[in-house]
């Protein structure tokens, strides 16, 4: 058996025996958690048929679906120990945490995890903050991505494209929009803020979501407040095409999105 296969079996055996830590080794000190999970006004469903998905949510509003994917194997392979052992010396591309993410830098994955991935500070600009999300090398990381089970409901005429990331507490991407997609957290918690296409949120594209949380969010009137919710492992958030959204990682988080295009 190839070493890669042996690694996967070892990790899965540890997980099944209950030896894998609940956070996968992606620990977050309580002092690093600057925000809580907040309220949730996004509809949460424990079960959903494809017909319901298409007619009630696909083109009109976000929804959180529980238990829609079974990703125990992918989750086990995303533990800190497993990813560092398998991909530690591989280069990953970091992007700035601002709306347009213009700047990129390539570093070894181990260097990012052990030295660069830190909690977000309030005085840092998004344009000066690099973190790992998207721009994935699907060839070098194929042994991981081929184990992921994407949400089963797709829009007619679309296919799914993955965006995988790992980031420290307090990090996130400020408001932006693109096509429809899903977001799933593998470890940690991710807080989402959403506005419909016709309602442009008040934000600065080079400031972080964390600074927006402290400088703008508390002063929003009821009519200007976003839809929001925090997603946990085992939950998938669907967002329709062109919906504004910003994200904030409450903990050190491992996450994957599936963009439908």
Which residue stretches match the model-derived regions?
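N-terminal accessory scaffold of Fe(II)-dependent oxygenases
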Residues: 2-236, 244-261
